[in-house]
Amino acid sequence: MDNNDTYLHLSSSLQVAHGHLSSPPSQPPLSSMVSHHHPSIINGLGSPYSVITSSSLGSPSASMPTTSNMGYGALNSPQMNSLNSVSSSEDIKPPPGLAGLGSYPCGSPGSLSKHICAICGDRSSGKHYGVYSCEGCKGFFKRTIRKDLTYTCRDNKDCQIDKRQRNRCQYCRYQKCLAMGMKREAVQEERQRGRERSDNEVDSSSSFNEEMPVEKILDAELAVEPKTEAYMESSMSNSTNDPVTNICQAADKQLFTLVEWAKRIPHFSDLPLDDQVILLRAGWNELLIASFSHRSVTVKDGILLATGLHVHRSSAHSAGVGSIFDRVLTELVSKMRDMQMDKTELGCLRAIVLFNPDAKGLSNPSEVEALREKVYASLEGYTKHNYPDQPGRFAKLLLRLPALRSIGLKCLEHLFFFKLIGDTPIDTFLMEMLEAPHQIT
């Protein structure tokens, strides 16, 4: 397929996706082009996934054409609630008793290790609102109180709340926060102290967030997040034991949802269509890698594909891609897990990758650079607002970008090798991306 066909295919995807932005579609927006792509929203990662067993494949050695680095600008300039608030007809009040509380440790410092979160058992970052807790539970409790959110339990109001399942039921998580001793008034007092600050201390990033709202970026992430269970039946029946093939098939599916995601990022659709195509061509590999890395934070020694398949580290090593696979686990997945990167932060990092002013052929690189700067500013303001006790969090997030870029280029090298030897089936859209000229200067 020549480059004109590639351009028409991608630009057509952009135009079709543009008509499906008001809400997550019940039918695949690109069904007229590819009937087997299904963007939707994930319901949880706790259910068992099929595990790809190891197979053998020659180790890649070919190099792709030289491609210079994609810069991310100066590292000088958030985290939103990654959980959807669920309205409820019930008022949330401190319960007279919570099922299963007998097994919970007491919330007092004398009986609970200062290093353990009293709510979920994760690593504690200190005493928050009267209880030793992790940043995740601290932020969840604060958002619940400040936004006066109410939740509903879909089971029997006795859901297990631990490190792996704390996001499953917001109702039971909040009830446990109260039961362990978190104080609503502590959040309210903290907010009052913030209001008493001088008018001169108004966050200078607020105007940037209005131009590049992190809420919209989070919406984009949630709108195209795959329902892994929707793929399970087809994945189980059609899966091979070759992890490289399965990764390529998952990437091909996600390339279509990537178009829809980009159209939801503020101001992307305002760019000329040619520039939209160029930006997606330039960053698709890093955008997909960032997504599946974050999706895999709950997986041990493996990655979770959008198709619901779990690729284990041992399978990747047997297939000859162990080195790059280990880099994904140590430089991306592990780091995201350790800092508890949320969906809004992930979305902002992906938006920074998307708005790449160095992509070759842009009609107005300065306009793209200005959009990237707005994402920087919104992300910085977000982290300051949501993590005031982590002043280095913004810089820590940006430090994932060079690793993502390096890993993205190495993955391209592997894909070019597999395309060259022809042993791995590479589907339509992914093949087009590989055949398109590189857009990085």
UniProtKB/Swiss-Prot annotation:
GO-annotated molecular function: DNA-binding transcription factor activity; nuclear receptor activity; nuclear steroid receptor activity; retinoic acid-responsive element binding; zinc ion binding
Compositional bias ranges of the Basic and acidic residues kind: 188-200
Tissue distribution of the protein: Uniformly expressed from the blastula to mid-gastrula stages. In late gastrula stages, there is specific expression in the presumptive hindbrain and spinal cord. At 16 hours post-fertilization (hpf), expressed in the hindbrain from rhombomere 7/8 to the anterior spinal cord; this expression continues until 42 hpf. At 24 hpf, also expressed in the lateral plate mesoderm flanking rhombomere 6 and in the cranial neural crest, but not in the migrating crest. At 26 hpf, also expressed in retina. At 48 hpf, strong retinal expression.
Stretches that traverse the bilayer: none
Keyword Zinc-finger belongs to the record: yes
GO biological process annotation, one example: cell differentiation
Pfam families found in the cross-reference section: Hormone_recep, Nuc_recep-AF1, zf-C4
DNA-binding feature ranges: 117-182
Location in or out of the cell: Nucleus
Keyword Kinase in record: no
Domain NR LBD: 209-437
Region (Modulating): 1-116
Free-text note on domains in this protein's UniProt record: Composed of three domains: a modulating N-terminal domain, a DNA-binding domain and a C-terminal ligand-binding domain.
Family: Belongs to the nuclear hormone receptor family. NR2 subfamily.
Name of the molecule in the record: Retinoic acid receptor RXR-gamma-A
Organism for this UniProt entry: Danio rerio (Zebrafish)
